[in-house]
Amino acid sequence: MQLLKSPDESEVYQGQFGEFTITQSDRTGVLIYRAGLGVAALCFAIGATLVLQQSDNPIAIQAVTPVFACFWIALGVSLATIHIYMIALHRALQVFWAIGGAAALFVAVQSSEPLALAVYEHPATLWGIGFIFAALNGIYFKEAFCFNRLETKFLTPGVPLLILGHMFGFLSAENEQFLLAIWAALFIIFAVRKFFQPIPQDIGDKSVFEYLKHQ
């Protein structure tokens, strides 16, 4: 992707299948995507801290539920504005997000326990709620593949390891806590670093999007 010229309102690039422009609207979409990731990372870190540091505090554990809801909404915003060449993959991640959100709502409404405790005590709930983290992991994979980000290279295998480890019980509580803490820390690092990445990189080659659209 090569910059050809910079008019006042848009930038013109040479893509694989022809020229394309990056407009202010494109840039705004990227900023929204990154802001969503930032809010999601912050909410995840807060939730992880409450679980790891205040597990004996009923109020703290109950507070995880609204924090998780904010995380889910922010992730949805990012999934709505992310640029992925494969439309089917993009839609699949959005469907995963929606399924996981519906499952989390069902568990939160049906369970007499706070959501965090219900998931911890009943690992089978992750068969539904886990779709949220599958969607998030799709973003990690995309960022690792496209931009060679070190933190997402650890997150891409680390997230399913923790989720599956809890579902099937092959991780100790100490290992789960360690992986959760690492996940929260790397997620924050990833989200912060995104704000310093050149915006056109997140937009990608729009000529490819246009080409695939007509296939």
Spans of model-derived segments:
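Loop-to-transmembrane alpha-helix initiation sites
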Residues: 171-183
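N-terminal topogenic module of multi-pass integral membrane proteins
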Residues: 1-72, 209-213
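Membrane-proximal helix-loop-helix units in multi-pass membrane proteins
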Residues: 101-160
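Helical transmembrane-bundle signal
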Residues: 37-47, 51, 71-78, 101-105, ...
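A glycine-rich, hydrophobic loop/mini-helix early in the fold
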Residues: 59-114
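C-terminal ends of transmembrane helices
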Residues: 75-89, 136-146, 194-195
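Short, highly charged, low-complexity non-transmembrane loops/tails of multi-pass membrane proteins
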Residues: 200-215
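Structural signature of hydrophobic alpha-helical transmembrane segments
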Residues: 57-73, 116-130, 180
